[in-house]
A protein has these predicted regions:
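Glycine-rich phosphate-binding loop of nucleotide-binding enzymes
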Residues: 51-54, 70, 77, 84-91, ...
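Pre-P-loop entry segment of helicase/translocase ATPase cores
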Residues: 406-435, 439
Length: 474
């Protein structure tokens, strides 16, 4: 289990050393409409394109990619350490603002059952089919019902026009695909229609099948995409908001501990609730990082001299300095060494989460569960008071950030917010193979989709190898 410690080689969460934040870097973007007159005006998108590039503000463009989960939780500690270092390398490669999003989206369980269970043929064997279907249904109920997890990374850049932005995204993708391939994760650019569907599925939870907007057709007819993805009602309160089908609350991580387990982010996003969690990251240029670190170091040295002068005036000629100042000096020296020698980078990081429920009582209960998970690791979460709309826009994979609550982290501290957990297999028209031991979701595979569909069935005597082979043969 990888843990971030303040003075260990693996990195540490910087605690209050950068109170004079680089306001320009972490400044939140302004809403397109300060006072929206319609639900459509709450959607922070100016222009869309078929290739998936959205203009979210004047001269600011974003593009979203879906990336697959990999088996991280099942690895040995040494393998996790190696993967962790590769992920750090991936994070260091970013020189633009990005957002990592884990979306616990709605899943049609009836459709899953229909796809996996055997259909009745009334040929005298339906009793056996029913017994088999009962086993599958029992296993489905043990998993995370009604929830399917997807992961996205949204890149945001500033360019003069669409063509320049498109060229820049092409350049970014060259290294992005390579870095994710080294992690074993498949990165897929999301088209404009797919990005709109992700937003539609959030706004119209439970009505996912109603989405039928096409950007190419919309251009011909002059249809506003906002009308097709938004819901009919959106009302914001101090600490929650509601729409036509659900109540939601936006929260954020307010406080981090001195050390943090790499399982924390997984535990937070693995709760069996409909939620969207985003990690907003703003890289700080290396030259600016060293400049501010040196400035801090000189400031601490100056404080030490002043303390000594004050003591000398009081006829106290001890060379001891206060514990707080001594601690600050040691911390800043450790950070400077890591930035110089271990290729650490500095980032502004903010974690925001939107949770959904059918009523306010259920919402409060869910937030208590999240708070319990956070407190168990030494973190604390808080509600985005009077900022529910801004937090919602920040969480969604649009490419805007309207919340300024961020803190500084080094590369390895950021990497501890690990978005990878375990790979799921749920192929369409597949066969039930068992249960994922980590997620408890069923494994449904379709070997016909593989490049080579051959396989072996391993097991001890009596494990059911012959039965499994016969089930595949039908």
């Amino acid at each position: 289990m990888i843990v971030v410690l303040r003075k260990k080689e693996k990195g540490w969460i910087t605690m209050g050393l950068f109170k004079d934040n680089f306001t320009l870097l972490k400044k939140a973007s302004e809403p397109l409409y300060k006072t929206p007159k319609s639900v459509q005006q709450t959607i922070e998108i100016m222009k869309i394109s078929e290739c998936g590039i959205f203009e979210v503000a004047s001269g600011k463009y974003s593009k979203t990619y879906r990336f697959s989960d990999v088996n991280y939780a099942t690895r040995t500690e040494n393998e996790q350490e190696s993967f962790f270092q590769r992920y750090c390398k991936c994070l260091n490669s970013f020189d633009c603002t990005f957002k990592i999003t884990v979306n616990n989206k709605n899943k049609d369980m009836e459709l899953l059952k229909k796809d996996v269970m055997l259909s009745y043929e009334q040929d005298g064997f339906d009793k056996m089919r029913k017994s088999y279907n009962n086993i599958i249904e029992e296993k489905i109920l043990e998993g995370r019902q009604g929830i399917e997890q997807e992961r996205y990374i949204t890149i945001s850049i500033e360019r003069k026009n669409f063509e320049e932005a498109k060229a820049q995204f092409t350049t970014i993708e060259n290294s992005l695909f390579k870095n994710f391939a080294e992690l074993g994760s498949k990165l897929i650019p999301i088209s404009g229609n797919e990005r709109l569907k992700i937003l539609h599925d959030y706004y119209r939870l439970g009505k996912e099948e109603e989405f039928d907007f096409d950007i190419k057709e919309g251009k011909k007819t002059g249809t506003d995409f906002r009308n097709d993805i938004c819901n009919s009602k959106l009302k914001f309160y101090q600490d929650y908001y509601e729409d036509e089908s659900k109540v939601c609350r936006a929260i954020y991580i307010k406080k981090y501990p001195t050390y943090l387990s790499d399982r924390f982010f997984t535990e937070l996003t693995f709760l069996p609730i409909h939620s969207i969690t985003s990690v907003d990251v703003v890289p700080v240029p290396k030259d600016m990082t060293m400049r501010i670190l040196q400035k801090k170091y000189l400031g601490i040295e100056s404080n030490i001299i002043k303390q000594q002068q004050t003591r000398n005036k009081n006829n106290d000629f001890s060379s001891e300095i206060s514990y707080t100042t001594r601690r600050q000096k040691a911390d800043i020296e450790d950070i400077m060494n890591n930035v110089r020698e271990n290729d650490e980078s500095l980032f502004f990081v903010g974690v925001t989460m939107v949770v959904m429920a059918e009523n306010i009582e259920e919402l409060d209960s869910i937030c208590e569960s999240i708070d319990s998970v956070a407190r168990g690791t030494g973190c604390s979460v808080d509600i985005c008071q009077y900022k529910q709309r801004e937090a919602l826009n920040t969480v969604l994979p649009i490419g805007v950030r309207q919340i300024e609550t961020m803190r500084t982290m080094l590369t390895q501290s950021l990497a501890v917010l690990m978005p990878f957990n375990v790979q799921e297999i749920c192929d369409k028209s597949g066969i039930y193979y068992g249960v994922n031991q980590i997620s408890k979701n069923i494994i449904v595979g379709n070997r016909k989709k593989l490049l080579n569909g051959n396989g072996f069935i391993f097991g001890v005597s009596g494990a059911g190898k012959s039965f499994q082979a016969k089930m595949e043969m039908g």
